[in-house]
């Protein structure tokens, strides 16, 4: 978060979310602005209007986990595209944690933010080798 945020900046994250996001934000003095997804909607992304209400001058990014940890919900191409368009329109980063993209147990197809080149200037993809190669506990970063 330090590479895209200054102390006091904000990152919008749909909740429930991976608990360590709070720790990462706290370590960077960044404020997490939660936006609640609901079990009644199978944890789909809230409406764009709900995100728009959270954006202000301190907002620097929207962070998604796709598939979502802990809900397992896989965001659709439409959901990813809509939220990425909102980020682009507001000159925000769209940070997408795709660590679990190979762990989908339905017919739902995973759509990566990087599949659409128009978002490349705003997109940051988070990935890990620990899940894919069964290297749990390995703390290896790569760019």
What are these regions, as identified by a protein language model?
Residues 1-10:
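Phosphate-binding glycine-rich loop
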Residues 3, 23-25, 86:
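Hydrophobic/aromatic ligand-binding patch that stacks against planar heteroaromatic rings
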Residues 9, 30, 89-93, 119-121:
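A short helix->loop->beta-strand "cap" motif at the edges of active sites that frequently abuts
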Residues 15, 34-39:
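Short beta->alpha connector loops at strand-helix junctions that form conserved
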Residues 26-33:
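A short helix-loop-beta submotif of the ANL/AMP-binding
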Residues 38-109:
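Active-site phosphate-binding strand-loop segment of PLP-dependent enzymes
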Residues 115-143:
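Active-site PLP attachment segment
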């Amino acid at each position: 978060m330090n590479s895209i945020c200054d102390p006091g900046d904000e990152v919008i994250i749909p909740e429930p979310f991976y608990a360590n996001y709070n720790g990462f934000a706290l370590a960077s003095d960044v404020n997490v602005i939660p936006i609640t997804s609901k079990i009644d909607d199978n944890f789909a992304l809230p409406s764009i209007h709900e995100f728009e209400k959270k954006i202000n001058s301190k907002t620097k990014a929207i962070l998604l986990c796709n598939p979502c940890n802990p809900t397992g919900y896989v965001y659709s191409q439409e959901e990813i595209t809509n939220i990425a368009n909102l980020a682009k329109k507001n000159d925000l980063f769209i940070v997408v944690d795709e660590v679990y993209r190979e762990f989908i147990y339905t017919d739902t197809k995973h759509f990566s933010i990087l599949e659409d080149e128009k978002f490349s200037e705003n997109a940051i993809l988070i990935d890990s080798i620990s899940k894919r190669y069964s290297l749990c506990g390995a703390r290896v970063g790569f760019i």
